[in-house]
Amino acid sequence: MSDDVTQRSFAAAVKDRLRRYPALYRILRSLVLPINRRRQVSRWRRNGRPVPPPHAFKQLTIEGYRRAFRLASLVETGTYAGDTVEAQRKRFRKVVSIELSPDLYRAALARFANRQNVMLLEGDSADLMESVVAQLEGPALFWLDGHYSAGITAHGNLDTPVQRELEIILASADDHVILVDDARCFGSGDYPTLDAVRTLVGRLRPDWTCVVEDDIIRIHPTSRPLHASRGERPSTAL
C-alpha cells in the first residue's frame, strides 16, 4: 500500500471519529476548508492555470464578484451535488438553485432541508428563469452551470439552455452579474459561440463588460471593478 493511500485512509478514519462530536467537527472543518481551498488554488496556479480550474477557484471567483458588486442573492443553474450551494449559502442572503434531474433535486432537498435561505427548484432553467428573475429583489449574481455532462446529469431539450438564460437575465431591468462556467464548451453542440454571446450582450446591454478568463465568461456592468477575484490576471475580452 502506497504512502498516499495510507494517508487517505488515516484521514478518513480521523474524519469518521470526529463526526461523533458534531460541534467539534464543524469548528475544525470551518478552519481546515479555507486552508485546503487556498492550497488547491495555489497548486493550480503553479501548474500554469490549466482549464478547467478547480472548484475552489470558482468559489473564490463567485465570492470576489459578490463583494465587488455587493450582491445579496445568488442564482445557480445546475445544482448537481449542491457543493456550490453549500459553499455560498452563508455568504448570500438568498440562494436559488435550479436542477433538471429529479434524483439530484431530491438529494439536494435532503441536504438543505433546514436551510431557510436556500430555495431549490426542479425543472429546465430555460423554462424557470423568467419566473426566478421576476421574483428577485434587486441585482443578483448568476452562476450558470446547467448543462448535460453525461453520467447522472439530466438532458433537456438542448445540451445547454444558456442562450435562453442569458436572454432573460440580460433583458431584466436590474444590473445583475453573470458568470458562465465552462467557456471552453462554447461553439460546440448546442452552445452558442463566444462571438454570439458578445453580440447578445452588446445588443441588450451595450454598456456592459463581457470578458472570459480561466474558463469563466464574466458579464457585468462596466461601472464596477473588473477584477473581482483575488489574484486574477487581467481578463481578456471575448
Language-model features: locations:
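A short alpha-helical cap/connector motif
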Residues: S2-L141, H147-L238
